């Protein structure tokens, strides 16, 4: 009896293998070679290529060393929180590796002087300032399908005005028009983005939902489609000012990884964005160094390998600016301890704090 059942299982297994082979060959005949394959056959499919955000702490918090290529990323937050700055830093990092980048400026507000200060190569940056949302997304689709673009930024979703709204009268009610536009565009774009290995960053604004009694009343514009299609969603906020005497020199910024399909989400980091200079890398080295135990802090003094960096955080930052070789050494050590630091980020910004954000995913 047991031999008969064993033979039956073997026969079924052979039949299934034959049926699968026949199905695979039929699919390849109909849709071309490579339309279906076993995932383990091609190692490159598993590996995720990333681009640095320009912030060491955010790269570590993302879990894969930066923002993923071939995926959709959403950066959202209040006004003047650093959304465009973060996107421009990502463009600058991609250009350093020889990548070609594009910026679809739907807000018509890109400052080329500031972009250059952040390290963006303006001569090799493609820029478009479209008149309508349809035109912006059509340009985005064409650039992505070309396969030549590494990073494409759309600034911003809220400024993608549907053609019907532009051609209509002021005060016309056109409910759901922008949401439908985004939903259709993302359905078309998502396959091309994956095939071309192009990262598309959508910058988004915040709106308030009326009549919300419990949870966060905040929501992002353009409907729910982008929340689903995005592999990474970053919530960026200004939490304070950096002052030198009475003059404000920059912003203290907090970024929460609200959604992450590539690593554990709900991590949050804090860094400085200095006016006219962008993300303060030396400030991050001091803060992360103390967190990882690489930089020692005794009272107000900061030291590294028994060598004093300065009294007070600003003096320590200035020392690292003046001594780039020490800064490089600290950065190398921090990257080697990235796993331990990432766990501390998770402890700092747990899922309880981000329950509202997670509900929006």
From Swiss-Prot:
- Tell me, in one coarse class, where this protein mainly resides: cytoplasm
* Pfam assignment, any one: RecA_C
Q: Does the keyword Nucleus apply?
A: no
Q: Name one GO molecular function term.
A: ATP hydrolysis activity
* Any one of the GO BP annotations: SOS response
Domain of life assignment: Bacteria
Q: Which GO terms describe its cellular component?
A: cytosol
Stored NCBIfam families? tigrfam_recA (TIGR02012)
Q: Which family does it belong to?
A: Belongs to the RecA family.
Q: What protein is this chain from?
A: Protein RecA
Q: Which organism is it from?
A: Brucella suis (strain ATCC 23445 / NCTC 10510)
Q: Which classification does the entry list for the species?
A: Bacteria, Pseudomonadati, Pseudomonadota, Alphaproteobacteria, Hyphomicrobiales
In the UniProt record, the gene name given for this protein reads recA
